């Protein structure tokens, strides 16, 4: 069992830290009242659940409940429950800038100067800072760099970092672009099987339409270019912390060309070892006469 208490100054990056730990497979709870830590630890250590990595964010947002933290930590030690503390810190000037940019009030100085709140918080957290197993100063760290530091400390040996989950969506422009799209490609420049009587009734999944759409040189070149682009983008998105990518392929009605192209891209990514899903959003819409969709 690895039991991590994440704490530190407001604005120092605890939210990003807990997200990074979650990506590493930690069961995470934000702002748990310190008085509940002993009972929670007991349940985790003594249960037969498969949860073996826990991360709790504990900070001064708990108000007067925060004062129970040291008593709870003492209980953990006496009970033999191992824990470690990760403390997030940053320079006063950086914290002030972050608060001003986010337009948030400091929890210890809601009606006063941000600096006063930071100074009060430092004093309140001094003992916890000295107890910390790991201290990360985020003053000069970008989000990606903080995640890399978290990974270097808490990623288990041999653990593979989370992969990017790619979802390829085919759609029809007449029903609207999927609102969660990251990348949108328009394949209406390709010859349309809809206007060929013997192909109209088939979808892009079926062989007659697929063979027709893929028979053109521009189709093959387009798919090759999309595959090359995604091979370049996926590792770079991962470096920046992105975990999901929605690639939307659109034609007029979402039944023929976009379906064939989406399937082709899906198969290529799968063969490349990517984690990939496929969704033909509008494949039945011309039949069902649906309206605009999300």
UniProtKB/Swiss-Prot annotation:
GO terms for molecular function: ATP binding; GTP binding. Pfam families: PapZ_C, RapZ-like_N. The keyword Lipoprotein does not apply. Signal peptide: none annotated. It comes from the Bacteria. Keywords: ATP-binding, GTP-binding, Nucleotide-binding. InterPro entries: P-loop_NTPase (IPR027417), RapZ-like (IPR005337), RapZ-like_N (IPR053930), RapZ_C (IPR053931). ATP binds at residues 8-15. GTP binds at residues 59-62. Belongs to the RapZ-like family. HAMAP family: RapZ_like. This is Nucleotide-binding protein CA_C0511.
